[in-house]
């Protein structure tokens, strides 16, 4: 789920913290990618028609491999250096959210069965997507594919979004790419949406800067974390009746969840029983991450390994895979130039921030202070 309604909240209240960027703007940049979110998108979109998906001869789904292969090649061709980060064990506080997701998939499965019996194509399309789940096998197959492509893989001890943010905070990558906004709450200095969009539409990349988010919202990082918890996150329920705009107003007025709880109208707003907001806050401020990872390297592709895995084991077209390998090799040579050309021909965003209402209040700048395990990182 991520942070409920955060994109719209920022568009309405912190437009200067958001800017559209071209794909090519990130030439030579290391980008940490939330792998599970990308795989989920590929399973939903790539090669899907109703209940039909891409499969190999054994009937195993290959949409995630097709999507990961093609999208990663596009990143490499643009000179981007992706680092895919995979989820580890979820925190205990997330079990309730995972149980909700399981229940929703069960309901969708029942609805899908009825839609199939009725021959309702639109309903089949809708409910089949809601039954999608990223499995351990999907993750392991994508890790194998990426390593064969010469692309670095990081296995997070816990949440991938937190690990991505830690890599960015410690200058091991330039930005974090995902569709869920959690990485901003974990303090990632730069966050990118739509970089991994698998649709055929050319959607511009949306870049967020956490420092500008805080400045525009006139909040400290601690207050921003409380805002995200109030808006709705994966770690606990939110207060019924309080959405993003109300949460922002309350945080600006009272400064913290504790102060809000002391002053809120409890007849109007129902506080969740045994609400673990303090533990949720701790998970955002002190996530379980590691920087003790192998040096990030983008190696030459294992051509024989890719043919074996994609063509022989998963039924991919031999000619297409061979041509794709050539693209990877060419892209690697191109990216070895680094960002030297930026000294002569910088890529500048042509977007104009959305307008917002004038405010007479003086914004307060704040800097995220995150705790991570391990030592410092490499230059991004």
Curated annotation (Swiss-Prot):
Q: Which Gene3D superfamilies match?
A: 5' to 3' exonuclease, C-terminal subdomain, 5'-nuclease
Residues recorded as binding Mg(2+) 1, renumbered to this chain, are 34, 87, 159, 161
Q: Which PROSITE patterns match?
A: XPG_1 (PS00841), XPG_2 (PS00842)
List every stretch annotated I-domain: 123-254
Q: Which GO terms describe its biological process?
A: base-excision repair; DNA replication, removal of RNA primer
Q: Which cofactor does it need?
A: Mg(2+)
**Stored Pfam families:** XPG_I, XPG_N
Give the start-end ranges of region Disordered: 351-380
Please list the GO terms describing molecular function: 5'-3' exonuclease activity; 5'-flap endonuclease activity; DNA binding; magnesium ion binding
Q: What is this protein called?
A: Flap endonuclease 1-A
Organism from which the protein derives = Oryza sativa subsp. indica
Upper taxonomic lineage:
Eukaryota, Viridiplantae, Streptophyta, Embryophyta, Tracheophyta
């Amino acid at each position: 789920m991520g942070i409920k309604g955060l994109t719209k909240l920022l568009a309405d209240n912190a437009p200067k913290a958001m800017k559209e960027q071209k794909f090519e703007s990130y030439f030579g940049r290391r980008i940490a990618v939330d792998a599970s979110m990308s795989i989920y998108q590929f399973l939903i979109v790539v090669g899907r028609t109703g209940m039909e998906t891409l499969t190999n001869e054994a009937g195993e789904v290959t949409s995630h491999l097709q999507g990961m292969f093609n999208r990663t090649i596009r990143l490499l061709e643009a000179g981007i250096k992706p680092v895919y980060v995979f989820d580890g064990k979820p925190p205990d506080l997330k079990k309730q959210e995972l149980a909700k997701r399981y229940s929703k998939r069960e309901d969708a499965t029942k609805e899908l069965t009825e839609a199939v019996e009725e021959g309702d194509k639109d309903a089949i399309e809708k409910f089949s997507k809601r039954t999608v789940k990223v499995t351990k096998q999907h993750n392991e197959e994508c890790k194998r594919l990426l390593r064969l492509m010469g692309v670095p893989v990081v296995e997070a001890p816990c949440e991938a979004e937190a690990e991505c943010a830690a890599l960015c905070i410690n200058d091991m990558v330039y930005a974090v790419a995902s569709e869920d906004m959690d990485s901003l709450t974990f303090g990632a200095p730069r966050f990118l949406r739509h970089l991994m969009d698998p649709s055929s539409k050319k959607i511009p990349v949306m870049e967020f800067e956490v420092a500008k988010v805080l400045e525009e919202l006139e909040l400290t990082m601690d207050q921003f974390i409380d805002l995200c918890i109030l808006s709705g996150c994966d770690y606990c329920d939110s207060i019924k009746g309080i959405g993003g705009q109300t949460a922002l107003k309350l945080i600006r007025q009272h400064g913290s969840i504790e102060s809000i709880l002391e002053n809120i109208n409890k007849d109007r707003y129902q506080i969740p029983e045994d609400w673990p907001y303090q533990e949720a806050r701790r998970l955002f401020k002190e996530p379980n991450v590691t920087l003790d990872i192998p040096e990030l390297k983008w190696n030459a592709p294992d051509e024989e390994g890719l043919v074996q895995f994609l063509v022989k084991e998963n039924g991919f077209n031999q000619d297409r895979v061979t041509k794709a390998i050539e693209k990877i090799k060419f892209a690697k040579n191109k990216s070895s130039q680094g960002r030297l050309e930026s000294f002569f021909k910088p890529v500048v965003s042509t977007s104009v921030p959305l307008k917002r209402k004038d405010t007479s209040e003086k914004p307060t700048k704040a800097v995220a202070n995150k705790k991570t395990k391990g030592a410092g990182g490499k230059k991004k």
